[in-house]
Structure formats: C-alpha cells, structure tokens
Regions:
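Bacterial Sec-exported substrate-binding components of ABC uptake systems
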Residues: 2-3, 19
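Sec-dependent N-terminal signal peptides
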Residues: 3-13
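Flexible coil/turn and secondary-structure edge motifs
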Residues: 16-109
C-alpha cells in the first residue's frame, strides 16, 4: 500500500509541474485555418485548436458561421509552453498577420 501512495504522489507531482508550464491563449483573426497555421510554426506552441466563440446558435456548422448568421467568430485556442514562448510573442505574431481595421476578413481571407 505504501508503494501505491508513493507512486500516486510522484505521478501527481509530475502532472502538476507539467501542467504548470502550459498556458492557453485565444485569438480571433478571420479564417481559423490560416490563424492556426501561423501559430503552429512558432517554437513553444504545443497545440492549436480551431473553433467558434460567441454567437447565438448552439452548435453551429462552418457554413452557418461563414454566412454570418450566427454571430460567431472563428477562433483558435493556442496551448503553449510559457517557459519557451511568451504571451507577448504570441500577440506579436497575431498583430503581424491581421488588419485590425478589417472586421470581416483576416489572414488570407
């Protein structure tokens, strides 16, 4: 039994220290596939997940969102190692790739 407690303690501490290194940031910059590709190229970015934010329609389709009828925006969730890349660097990547004065088409849209 004491070995199980020791193993549990080691695994629990390892898991906490690993997850403490990771952070999440969300960006909406038009076509999420273009935004996704831009962030995936950065060292320290672990994963980029596309999805939707806001809106009035529950579980909208891509077609519904792109027609502009749902109020949703295409967004990406960026999971990154904050010991390798800073949030500021992620923001710089975002601002370099969008036009903040264009509300309807960003990146390669």
């Amino acid at each position: 039994m004491k070995y199980l407690i020791i193993i549990f303690f080691i695994l629990t501490n390892t898991n906490f220290s690993y997850s403490a290194q990771k952070d999440k940031a969300y960006f909406a910059g038009g076509c999420f596939w273009c935004v996704e590709e831009s962030f995936e190229k950065l060292n320290g970015v672990e994963e980029v997940i596309s999805g939707y934010s806001g809106g009035i329609t529950e579980n909208p389709t891509y077609k519904e969102v792109t027609y502009g009828k749902t109020g949703h925006f295409e967004v990406v969730e960026v999971i990154y190692d904050k010991n390798i890349i800073s949030y500021e660097r992620l923001l710089n990547n975002f601002w370099v790739n969008i036009d903040p004065f264009d509300a309807y088409g960003q990146f390669c849209d």
